[in-house]
Regions:
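Carbohydrate transferase catalytic cores enriched for Leloir-type hexosyltransferases
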Residues: 1-287
Length: 287
């Protein structure tokens, strides 16, 4: 609050969804809405945070002039739970940082790769169990997993699986350049997320023209135009495991490089940055 009083901006952009305190000043407020997961997936966030999120976002929207969404899906779900958001000026533009600047030589080192947060919401439990089933069915590729460990039970599951199958490797947090090196050498990227607001890793992987295997969440269809391998997530846990194992055995290794390029170009930081710039500048000039 003190900094805002000193700076006196035309627009205050909050990069998170909720502003827990009421701000006072002669400036407009823009918030960023990434997802409605605390409402949609209470099992991952808990009942207390669900109540906190609903209560405080409703308060935040009363004082919000502009909304930046990361996807059309997020916009739809926000307006479903908070119809008042329909009356607030908004734009859909997800700015991706750390773009790929080096030209990597792609190879196939015979491994599946997952890089992301190590939690159930990202489908890591499904990935481990699906991979073990894939090996039971005769699959030969290795599995490399990277990402910050978030949950104790996932940590136990991963290390137990590594004891059972020496073809599973867990790398913990993966630095940016190492991640790109792994992308370049993988056979396919596996992203079995159970709840996703956008799915930035999929866009990153498309730069390498590698096959992608993902759950059939609607957001993945939105951002990829349907140009990836997907498996059915809307079934029992056992069926999910079987579905993932089967597609790991039989995924389409061919990639439509022109379709990938079109998706990558749509999410270039320069393009999305201009959308945000025009939105903010246009609002400031008209209000």
């Amino acid at each position: 609050k003190k900094q805002l009083e000193l700076i006196k901006p035309d627009i205050f952009w909050e990069v998170n969804t909720i502003i827990p305190v009421k701000l006072k000043g002669d400036y407009r407020i823009m918030i960023t809405i990434h997802d409605m997961f605390p409402i949609e997936y209470v099992e991952y966030f808990g009942r207390v945070y669900n109540i906190y999120f609903k209560h405080n976002l409703k308060k935040t929207l009363k004082n919000t002039d502009m909304i930046l969404y990361n996807s059309e899906q997020t916009k739809r779900t926000t307006e479903k739970f908070f119809p008042e958001a329909k009356d607030i000026d908004n734009v859909n533009a997800y700015i991706i940082s750390n773009p790929v600047r080096k030209n990597w030589i792609s190879t196939d080192e015979n491994y599946f790769l997952y890089i992301g947060n190590m939690e159930k919401r990202k489908g890591v439990d499904l990935l481990i169990n699906g991979y073990l089933k894939y090996k039971e069915l005769g699959g030969k590729k290795k599995l490399i997993i990277g990402g910050k460990m978030q949950e104790d039970d996932i940590n136990t599951l991963v290390h137990d699986a590594m004891e059972k199958d020496k073809d599973i490797t867990y790398l913990d947090y993966v630095a940016h350049n190492k991640k790109l090196e792994l992308y370049a050498g993988m056979s396919a990227f596996v992203f079995p997320s159970k709840a996703e607001g956008f799915g930035m890793p999929i866009i990153e992987v498309m730069r390498f023209n590698k096959p992608i295997i993902a759950s059939n969440l609607p957001i993945f269809d939105e951002i990829t135009d349907g140009n990836i391998n997907t498996f059915d997530l809307y079934c029992s846990a056992d069926e999910q495991i079987k579905n993932l194992a089967q597609i790991m055995l039989n995924y389409n290794t061919n990639v439509d490089e022109s379709a990938y390029e079109a998706v990558v170009n749509r999410y270039l930081p320069e393009r999305l940055g201009k959308i945000v710039y025009d939105f903010v500048n246009g609002y400031r000039n008209n209000n």
